[in-house]
Structure formats: structure tokens, C-alpha cells
């Protein structure tokens, strides 16, 4: 019996890891088809700076990265550190909205995190249950890449290095 369990253990670990990463172990983005069904759900959210923004207004201006994080998430900190090094070059061509997915975190905690991480130019907002549900957000580092017409260009879960963020921003800025 113990031998069968030991043989099954690697399979169980693979299933567990697959489940914890949403099936996207590598962190690579998953391409959307561009169909109307792939339209990003619209929402309005208040940023930590007190500004009301809607996805439709952001996406009307320019392509938008919608990034779900938590201030306690080490992978998010790494991901956003990579963004910090690349995004300023593309800030006039791509919007970046970071939405905290932890409802227990206050706007003050999020503002402190933004300042500590040195992320000016990136809009931050507190968790909003309907937004999290609309985007099926379960994991930190969930990201959606949304075109001007609100079509989901790509989506993914997992950390991205600075070189990949550079490619993403460059590609989105030409959309």
C-alpha cells in the first residue's frame, strides 16, 4: 500500500502544482482569439488616489494592462520590480492598472506599497469583489493585456522578467 502511494505521489504533486498555478506553470500568456466573446468585462473602480476610472475609458485611450496582486505576495513584488524598470518608457502608450485582490488590505497599505516599490505612473486600486469575479481571479500575478477596443489580447498567471515585459509593452504600444 505504501509503495503504491509513493508511486502516485509525483502525479499528485503535478496535479497540485497545476491547480495552484491555474494550469499555467510557465507564466506564459495565453492568446485570446479576438472574438467578441473575448471582450474584457467593463467595470468602474476607484483608484487609491481617489479617481474613478472605468476599463472602457482606459482602453479607449490606449491598450491597458490589468494586473492583480497583493502587497504580501513576493512574486508580485518581483514582477512589479521588473515592470518598474521597463514601464516608464511606454507609459504614454500603455495604461497599467494594478488591482489588489486581498479585500483585507486598505488603500493606505496599497499606497505605502506603491511608494515602497517606487511605482509612479501606475494606477493602483483596492480589491472589488465583482471585478475579481468577472475576471475569474484566483491567483496573484494574474494579468490581462487588453486592446483599445477592450478585446483581451493575452492573459496569464505567473511572473514575467523585464525582457518579456519590454516585449509586451512594445507590442501593445503598436496595437
Regions found by a protein language model. Give the residues of each.
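Short, internal strand/loop/helix patches
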Residues: 113-149
Amino acid at each position: 500500500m505504501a509503495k503504491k502511494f509513493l508511486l502516485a505521489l509525483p502525479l499528485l504533486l503535478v496535479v497540485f502544482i497545476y491547480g495552484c498555478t491555474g494550469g499555467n506553470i510557465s507564466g506564459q500568456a495565453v492568446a485570446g482569439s479576438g472574438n467578441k466573446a473575448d471582450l474584457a468585462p467593463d467595470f468602474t473602480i476607484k483608484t487609491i488616489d481617489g479617481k474613478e476610472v472605468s476599463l472602457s475609458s482606459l482602453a479607449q485611450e490606449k491598450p491597458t494592462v490589468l494586473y492583480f496582486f497583493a502587497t504580501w505576495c513576493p512574486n508580485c513584488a518581483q514582477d512589479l520590480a521588473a515592470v518598474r524598470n521597463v514601464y516608464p518608457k511606454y507609459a504614454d502608450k500603455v495604461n497599467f492598472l494594478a488591482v489588489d485582490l486581498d479585500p483585507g488590505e486598505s488603500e493606505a497599505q496599497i499606497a505605502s506599497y506603491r511608494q515602497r516599490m517606487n511605482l509612479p505612473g501606475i494606477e493602483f486600486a483596492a480589491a472589488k469583489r465583482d471585478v475579481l469575479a468577472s475576471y475569474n481571479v484566483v491567483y496573484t500575478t494574474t494579468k490581462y493585456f487588453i486592446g483599445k477596443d477592450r478585446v483581451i489580447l493575452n492573459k496569464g498567471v505567473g511572473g514575467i522578467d523585464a525582457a518579456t515585459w519590454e516585449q509586451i509593452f512594445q507590442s501593445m504600444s503598436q496595437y
